[in-house]
Structures are given as structure tokens and as C-alpha cells.
């Protein structure tokens, strides 16, 4: 897997997702749960696990990618600073951006599938 994508996945699962039980219950924090019909990743990718360990270095690198260096657009623009799917109103889309703080949704998305979506986009969405 591409190191930048792996670092971004690590940031999402280790920094944003652990707050999901708290954030998902607050009002105005994105659609939860979210239905998607995203194409399933090839089996070998779908079953792959995030190889990066939980560390402050990996979280810091993932946060930098999420907020500043991802291209063509930074993830934060659509997914929001809290990862709740509420980003810059100029980048709103239908369907709305994935709410990473929604445990009901994110527990159903394996590491490999998330990697596949970040790398290849998701048909019918802004990614």
C-alpha cells in the first residue's frame, strides 16, 4: 500500500474514529448512519489490514495529510476538521461526505476497503 494512504487511514482510525461514540451522539455532526453503494475492493485489498502501528508520529503524519497535503483536495475540506462529514460549505456534495465519527457506518468499513476508496474514489460521490 502507498505510505501516504496508509498514514491517512491510520489517522482516520486512530485519531478521528475513536471519538465516534461521543461525537456521533451530538447534534449537527453529520449523517449517521450513512448508506453507500461503493464498489467493493478486490479481495486481496479488501482483506488487508493497516500495517502502521498506533503512534503519535503516525497520527501527526496522517493529520498533516488529512488537513494540508492530500491532493487534489485536502480531506478536511469535505470531511471536516472533526471528520464528521461537515466540511467547507463550498464543497458540499450529494451524497454528503463520509462521517468518520459514525460508529454504525465505520465499523462496517475494513481498512482495505477504506484504502481502496481513498486511492480510487467512490462512484456517485465527490471522491
Locate each region found by the language model:
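Electrostatic cytochrome c docking/interface patches
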Residues: 35-68
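Bacterial N-terminal signal peptides
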Residues: 8-17
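Bacterial N-terminal signal peptides that target proteins for export
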Residues: 1-8
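Solvent-exposed, polar/charged alpha-helical surfaces in well-ordered, non-transmembrane soluble domains
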Residues: 60-64, 76, 112, 116
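Gly/Gly-Pro-rich "capping" loops immediately C-terminal to redox-active cysteine motifs
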Residues: 56-57, 80-115
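Axial heme c-ligation environment in periplasmic c-type cytochrome domains
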Residues: 24-33, 94, 98-99, 117-127
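The canonical Cys-X-X-Cys-His
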Residues: 62, 70-82
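Sec/Tat signal peptide C-region and signal peptidase I cleavage site
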Residues: 18-24
Amino acid at each position: 500500500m502507498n505510505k501516504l494512504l496508509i498514514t491517512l487511514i491510520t489517522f482516520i482510525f486512530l485519531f478521528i474514529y475513536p471519538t465516534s461514540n461521543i461525537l456521533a451522539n451530538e447534534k449537527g455532526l453529520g449523517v449517521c448512519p450513512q448508506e453507500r453503494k461503493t464498489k467493493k475492493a478486490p479481495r486481496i485489498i479488501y482483506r488487508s489490514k493497516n500495517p502502521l502501528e498506533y503512534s503519535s508520529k503516525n497520527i501527526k503524519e496522517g493529520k498533516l495529510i488529512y488537513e494540508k497535503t492530500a491532493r487534489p483536495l485536502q480531506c478536511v475540506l469535505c470531511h471536516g476538521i472533526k471528520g464528521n462529514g461537515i466540511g467547507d460549505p463550498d464543497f458540499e456534495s450529494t451524497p454528503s461526505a463520509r462521517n468518520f465519527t459514525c460508529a454504525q457506518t465505520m465499523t462496517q468499513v475494513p481498512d482495505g476497503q477504506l484504502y481502496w476508496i481513498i486511492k480510487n474514489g467512490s462512484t456517485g460521490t465527490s471522491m
